[in-house]
């Protein structure tokens, strides 16, 4: 997972998530290897990230980027449905609200994913003291992700999967052959 950030003082690069569940599994199974989850923090990067962490005072900077991008797109297109969507987005941005707080249908989501305005991604606004682990937890929730764990004598591992994933999807994170050969199971 990649998290962009701006307006806050935090280290750029990879950060390990302090996962209490993985820690408990490792204490129980005493594996030779523990594979925790890492997040990559990217300073002032909005395109290649899954979520954006900003200081509350910097929200307008991102909204202005979105407005410029959307206004530029409106000037280049002629399809009424897309223009209506983009005008809806502009009105929302003018209220100083990020696009991630709006609900869109599948067709609108497709257009916005292609356009990729920064505030369409989950925005985590912070002020004052914060802990990196708390930011990661909020980002996981906002991006609708969860962990799938495997643990044994050889390794304890935290695998990132979309929230609500079935067992076959989780198994495919380990190896595609597991997903193909999986018969039945439940995520608990």
Residue ranges and their predicted role:
Residues 16, 61, 161-162:
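Residue-level detector of secondary-structure boundary/capping sites
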Residues 1-11, 76-188:
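C-terminal-of-GTPase-core extension/linker across diverse P-loop GTPases
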Residues 25, 70, 171:
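Residue-level signature of catalytic and energy-coupling elements of molecular machines
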Residues 1-58:
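Conserved G1/Walker A P-loop phosphate-binding module
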Residues 18, 63-66, 132:
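Generic alpha-helical segment signature
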Residues 47-78:
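Switch/coupling subdomain of P-loop NTPase systems
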């Amino acid at each position: 997972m990649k998290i962009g950030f701006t307006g806050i003082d935090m280290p750029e690069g990879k950060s390990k998530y302090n996962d209490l569940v993985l820690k408990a599994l490792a204490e129980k199974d005493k594996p030779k290897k523990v594979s925790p989850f890492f997040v990559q923090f990217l300073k002032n990067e909005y395109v290649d990230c899954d979520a954006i962490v900003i200081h509350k005072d910097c929200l307008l900077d991102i909204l202005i980027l979105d407005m410029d991008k959307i206004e530029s797109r409106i000037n280049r297109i002629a399809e009424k449905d897309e223009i209506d969507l983009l005008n809806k987005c502009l009105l929302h941005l003018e209220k100083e609200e990020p696009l991630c707080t709006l609900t869109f249908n599948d067709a609108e989501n497709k257009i916005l994913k292609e356009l990729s305005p920064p505030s369409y991604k989950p925005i985590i606004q912070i002020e004052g003291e914060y802990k990196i682990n708390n930011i990661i937890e909020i980002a996981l929730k906002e991006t609708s992700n969860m962990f799938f764990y495997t643990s044994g004598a050889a390794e304890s591992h935290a695998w990132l999967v979309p929230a609500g994933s079935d067992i076959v999807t989780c198994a495919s994170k380990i190896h595609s052959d597991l997903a193909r050969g999986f018969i039945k199971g439940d995520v608990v």
